[in-house]
């Protein structure tokens, strides 16, 4: 590293957006203007090269970004670590992981479509991790682009205190640049790749508009900054420096979202966006980070981005490369050097860092040391994503990230012998990389089942198996992750007895099972022991809980996990000789099976939040399609010839929806969906599912 490390001159930022808002294109421009690449390649470019940040073949082909690549760019005197995050909802765990290690973010919005469902998801994730953000309204060269409307949508839909700090000079094919309201100058991009930025006086026809929006901006800044408020009340003009300081303060304090505008594809406004990153987003030293002290019962303590303090670093992403596993890390405190020993806080293993690299999409440069606030990658370290690493002087953990449950599964099997060799290797790798990708073996059908966040999520992995591991697989029908639950309280009284010469088995348990309302911590099973007077010895109580819990893995109704059950153990009996841990565990399992039917079991299915956008003339058929799929319409909004339909639809009805939507709208409709909640299925469907399951079991037992 040629430059001296100065933490105040560092920005760790991500770009998050809805799919197709132009995120990879914007990153590509940032790399170009920051001197990291020497030619610009489009995402679906004619030159067949594909964008630099999309480093997997699959990404270049589909034009979507899957793995977030980390790149370091120099901009003026600043060092910017840029994390490219996927915008497709099926990959939200990647987005969450990136946000966890960022200090600030750019929320990218399409100037035509504005705030879409995925923008809402990403915004919710940013709020969860308290990430300060700028909004960049992109694609102003497109027909129907309107940054004023998009800013209103940020305020109404996302409840953000959004304020325009730039207004466009011309829109659609007239778009030439923007007016910066902080210094009241016009910025116009020129040159083949927009590399020259001309600073001019504001065009005469825009002066009044600029003054109006500057007043709105100052009014909003007065609410978050007392110095500006004073000047505002005295009707004095604040200086450019005062305005920028107030925007910075409001942004870092999460009280304000500055809105910038431009067109990355047409090379307009990206350099000023990079300036805004350095002006308004925090350095690692300004973002408060906390860790949990393992020695003090996970008590929270503050981390300081000080290289002299003990090391705390988080592994937030893993990637397999031809040279072995690459682990992306964010250093929160202390420093990390090549050859240092670091301790994985999950398994307490001490490992030596053989190689430390700085990443540029998929090229790398070796470095010797990295300091607090930096994002780097390590080779030769075996760990899972989300593990915390420290040096010998401290035991701490960054809190574990929120990982959602999977909603869809597929049975897969290798096609032939060649595929079989790499089959488990591929699954193992994907599991390590992505906590939402799960693999298990179904004992009864003897199949390998993969589960994930949606159809596309699993499709991508099936594709990657073929491409990266030369492993063709046969894919079964997608299976929805149903759940079973109970709807009424039911008492149980069960005695387990077995006498087979020698010591037998004996356990008696009495109590009730009852529905468990949704818990704050997301728990789906609760066990309460109310046994008094030693009716069951203490050491056998956990056995009863274990028995009940084991039985919830596969419900008797349709063979899916049972959730939302509270088991109360009230009484019981034991035998001095014949009672054992095993006997009480078996009693727990059998008691649940026996009492289950009288607790009126119901089947729950995943309900998805669907957002479909279609041209107005197709609204009728789009709504009809949703109704046919047992969907309920939540809202419809119209904008400029298009209609956005928000609905809740059961996932099981969504297979093949994209094909149907395309044919009904002549390819003009698009949709995105994400998991919303679990809800009971209609009675007739429950009976059908139960019948199928019983028939399947009967066939397996023959």
From Swiss-Prot:
Principal location listed in the UniProt entry: cytoplasm
Positions bound to GTP: 17-24, 84-88, 138-141
Protein keywords: Cytoplasm, Elongation factor, GTP-binding, Nucleotide-binding, Protein biosynthesis
Domain tr-type G: 8-285
A molecular-function term among this protein's GO annotations: GTP binding
Listed CDD domains: EF-G, EFG_III, EFG_mtEFG1_IV, mtEFG1_C, mtEFG1_II_like
Cell compartment(s), UniProt: Cytoplasm
Record Pfam families: EFG_C (PF00679), EFG_III (PF14492), EFG_IV (PF03764), GTP_EFTU (PF00009), GTP_EFTU_D2 (PF03144)
Function: Catalyzes the GTP-dependent ribosomal translocation step during translation elongation. During this step, the ribosome changes from the pre-translocational (PRE) to the post-translocational (POST) state as the newly formed A-site-bound peptidyl-tRNA and P-site-bound deacylated tRNA move to the P and E sites, respectively. Catalyzes the coordinated movement of the two tRNA molecules, the mRNA and conformational changes in the ribosome.
Similarity comment text for this entry: Belongs to the TRAFAC class translation factor GTPase superfamily. Classic translation factor GTPase family. EF-G/EF-2 subfamily.
The name this protein goes by in its record: Elongation factor G 2
Naturally occurring in which organism (per UniProt): Bdellovibrio bacteriovorus (strain ATCC 15356 / DSM 50701 / NCIMB 9529 / HD100)
């Amino acid at each position: 590293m040629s430059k001296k490390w100065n933490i105040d001159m560092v920005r760790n930022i991500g770009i998050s957006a809805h799919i197709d808002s132009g995120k990879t294109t914007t990153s590509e421009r940032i790399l170009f203007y920051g001197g990291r690449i020497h030619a610009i390649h489009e995402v679906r470019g004619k030159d067949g090269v594909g964008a630099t940040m999309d480093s997997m073949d699959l990404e270049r082909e589909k034009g979507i970004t899957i793995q977030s690549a980390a790149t370091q760019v120099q901009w003026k005197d600043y060092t910017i670590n840029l994390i490219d995050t996927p915008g497709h909802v099926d990959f939200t765990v990647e987005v969450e992981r990136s946000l966890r290690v960022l200090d600030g973010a750019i929320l990218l919005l399409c100037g035509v479509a504005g705030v879409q469902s995925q923008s809402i998801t990403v915004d919710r994730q940013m709020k969860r991790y308290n990430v300060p953000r700028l909004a960049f309204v992109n694609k102003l060269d497109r027909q129907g682009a309107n940054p004023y409307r998009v800013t209103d949508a940020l305020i109404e839909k996302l409840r953000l205190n959004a304020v325009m700090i730039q207004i466009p000079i011309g829109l659609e094919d007239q778009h030439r640049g923007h007016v910066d309201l902080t210094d009241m100058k016009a910025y116009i991009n020129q040159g083949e790749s927009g590399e020259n930025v001309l600073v001019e006086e504001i065009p005469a026809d825009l002066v009044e508009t600029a003054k109006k929006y500057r007043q709105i901006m100052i009014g909003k800044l007065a609410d978050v900054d007392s110095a500006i408020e004073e000047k505002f009340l005295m009707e004095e003009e604040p200086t450019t420096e005062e305005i920028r300081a107030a925007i910075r303060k409001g942004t870092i304090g999460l009280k304000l979202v500055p809105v910038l505008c431009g067109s990355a594809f047409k090379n307009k406004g990206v350099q000023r966006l990079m300036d805004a990153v350095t002006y308004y987003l925090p350095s690692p030293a300004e973002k408060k980070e906390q860790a949990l002290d393992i020695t003090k019962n996970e008590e929270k303590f503050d981390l300081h981005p000080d290289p002299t303090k003990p090391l705390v670093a988080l592994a937030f992403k893993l990637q397999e490369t031809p040279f072995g596993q690459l682990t992306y890390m964010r250093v929160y405190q202390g420093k990390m050097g090549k050859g240092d020993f670091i301790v994985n806080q999950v398994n307490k293993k001490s490992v030596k860092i053989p190689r430390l690299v700085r990443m540029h999409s998929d090229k790398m440069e070796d470095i010797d040391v990295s300091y607090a606030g930096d994002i780097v990658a390590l080779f030769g370290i075996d760990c899972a994503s989300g593990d915390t690493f420290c040096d010998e002087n401290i035991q701490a953990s960054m809190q574990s990230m929120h990982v959602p449950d999977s909603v869809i599964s597929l049975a897969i099997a290798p096609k032939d012998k060649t595929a079989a060799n790499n089959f488990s290797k591929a699954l193992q790798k994907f599991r390590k990389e992505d906590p939402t990708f799960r693999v298990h073996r179904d004992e009864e059908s003897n199949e390998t089942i993969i589960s994930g966040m949606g159809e596309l999520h699993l499709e991508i992995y099936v594709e990657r198996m073929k491409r990266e591991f030369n492993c063709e697989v046969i894919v079964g029908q997608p299976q929805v992750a149903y759940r079973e639950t109970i709807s009424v309280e039911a008492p149980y009284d069960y005695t387990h007895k077995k006498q087979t010469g020698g010591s037998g088995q004996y356990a008696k348990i009495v109590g009730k099972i009852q529905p468990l309302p949704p818990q704050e911590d997301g728990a789906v099973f609760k066990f309460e022991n109310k046994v008094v007077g030693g009716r069951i010895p203490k050491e056998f109580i956990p056995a009863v809980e274990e028995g009940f819990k084991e039985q919830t893995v596969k419900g008797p109704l349709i063979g899916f996990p049972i959730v939302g059950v509270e088991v109360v153990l009230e009484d019981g009996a034991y035998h001095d000789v014949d009672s054992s841990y095993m006997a009480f565990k078996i009693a727990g399992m059998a008691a649940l099976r026996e009492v289950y039917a009288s607790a009126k079991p119901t089947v729950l299915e995943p309900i998805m939040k669907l957002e479909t956008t279609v041209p107005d003339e197709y609204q009728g058929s789009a709504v009809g399609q949703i109704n046919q799929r047992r969907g309920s319409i939540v809202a419809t909004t119209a904008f400029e010839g298009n209609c956005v339909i928000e609905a809740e639809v059961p996932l099981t009805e969504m297979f093949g929806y994209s094909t149907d939507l395309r044919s009904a709208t002549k390819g003009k409709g698009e949709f995105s969906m994400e998991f919303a909640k679990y809800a009971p299925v209609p009675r007739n469907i429950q009976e059908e599912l139960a019948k199928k399951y019983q028939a399947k079991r009967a066939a397996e037992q023959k």
